[in-house]
Amino acid sequence: MSSIKKESSSGSENTGPSVFLSEIIGSSVTVRLHNGVEYLGNLQSIDGYMNIVLDETKEFVGGDQARNYGDVFIRGNNVLYISEA
């Protein structure tokens, strides 16, 4: 019989996405939408529906910067992913 070993990372807890997102509020993030558009800005707020508010936001279309915005509200159902920049 073969034995299966479970690896555990010492000192780290298994946390969900809501914990991660609450920890990065105020940080610079990249938000990619399903249509390929990306926004780079400071995460101000996020709710349970993944609705996002960014500040000092830059919009990138096809990898090129398209526009600069102050505040941006992004509806959660458009979000593909959020990453810390």
From Swiss-Prot:
Keyword Amino-acid biosynthesis part of the UniProt annotation: no
Family matches, as InterPro entries: Lsm6/sSmF (IPR016487), LSM_dom_sf (IPR010920), Sm (IPR047575), Sm_dom_euk/arc (IPR001163)
The keyword RNA-binding belongs to this UniProt entry's keyword annotation: yes
GO molecular function annotations of the record: RNA binding
SMART domains: Sm
GO cellular component terms given for this protein: nucleolus; P-body; sno(s)RNA-containing ribonucleoprotein complex; spliceosomal complex; U4/U6 x U5 tri-snRNP complex; U6 snRNP
Sm domain boundaries: 16-85
Record-level GO BP terms: maturation of SSU-rRNA; mRNA splicing, via spliceosome; tRNA processing
Localization annotation: Cytoplasm; Nucleus
Alphabetized UniProt keyword annotations: Cytoplasm, mRNA processing, mRNA splicing, Nucleus, Ribonucleoprotein, RNA-binding, rRNA processing, Spliceosome, tRNA processing
Annotated SUPFAM superfamilies: Sm-like ribonucleoproteins
Stated family: Belongs to the snRNP Sm proteins family. SmF/LSm6 subfamily.
Free-text function comment from the UniProt entry: Component of LSm protein complexes, which are involved in RNA processing and may function in a chaperone-like manner, facilitating the efficient association of RNA processing factors with their substrates. Component of the cytoplasmic LSM1-LSM7 complex, which is thought to be involved in mRNA degradation by activating the decapping step in the 5'-to-3' mRNA decay pathway. Component of the nuclear LSM2-LSM8 complex, which is involved in splicing of nuclear mRNAs.
Summary of subunit composition and partner proteins: Component of the heptameric LSM1-LSM7 complex, which consists of LSM1, LSM2, LSM3, LSM4, LSM5, LSM6 and LSM7. Component of the heptameric LSM2-LSM8 complex, which consists of LSM2, LSM3, LSM4, LSM5, LSM6, LSM7 and LSM8. The LSm subunits form a seven-membered ring structure with a doughnut shape.
Protein name: U6 snRNA-associated Sm-like protein LSm6
Lineage: Eukaryota, Fungi, Dikarya, Ascomycota, Saccharomycotina
Gene label: LSM6
